[in-house]
């Protein structure tokens, strides 16, 4: 039970869940995603609290945020799933069904304009950057998170900007279309591809 004051900003902690439950979408006023959505994936209220009565809230999970395809090398490629529009943040898992997720596919998140943040494991080997984040006008950050299993990751991030790493140095792979303000390019950057800033 939690007390919320009418007209104020609010948040509810996301529930603990197993992977089998799917990804937490948010808290709703009805079961199974029915009723009114109250929070985002982090449990932060979508707008100030507007009820003076007691309200029961229910967690909603989706198993269709992402779609996985098994590749010939026995690793998975990931792209958007049918429920992607329900999310404002997405975290790509390092594994799926016990196998490595190695690839962010072509057009993976094309035109997913509800998404503002994408978190990707440092174990990812291939990101089809020319199309994976195309037409994502509200995307402000692509973050690479540590899995603790990779010594020399293929990709890294800085303040939401995606870099590709090699022995010679870094290359800016993707600059989010929704990112604003000043940005200082990392000093060990050796390549800035043509049109990397064209959507900004």
What feature does the model see in each segment?
Residues 129:
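Acyl-donor-binding surface of acyltransferase catalytic domains
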Residues 82:
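Extended, loop-rich substrate-binding clefts of extracytoplasmic carbohydrate-active enzymes
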Residues 53-62, 104, 108, 169-171:
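A short, hydrophobic secondary-structure junction motif
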Residues 1-63, 90:
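Secondary-structure capping and domain/repeat boundary segments
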Residues 2-7, 65-74, 85-103, 112-126, ...:
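Structural signature of tandem-repeat unit edges
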